[in-house]
Amino acid sequence: MNRVYIGDPCYVIGDDNWQNFCDMIDNNDNSQVIFDFMGHNIFVMQTKYGDGVYELFDDKYTLIGKLCVDSGLLCVMSFDGVQKIDGIDDGCVIEIKDFNVDNVYSDENATLFAGKYFVKTDY
């Protein structure tokens, strides 16, 4: 099992690296992107309506946690890539067997899917 962070990247990307991270996102025209950031693959997507609180569920619709979003973005990354822990709760750090960021995606309704977990951002 791999520990995985799901949530707003602003809570886990170091302050010294935040601008560089944002520049990498701004250089991409898609609403979702997978890229290498400082040696770690990360999936980043825009939420449907920007900032807010979004719920993380598993495939049985069990509420796992609530994700605060202040940058209008959600990310999925290995916990090894976390640079800081700023205001995240246990619901944001989950275990995914054989985690591979290439298997993370969002659909046309801005619902994020990562393994058996999902986050709907279109309310």
PLM features: what roles do these ranges have?
Residues 1-123:
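Intrinsically disordered, low-complexity acidic regions enriched in Pro/Ser/Thr
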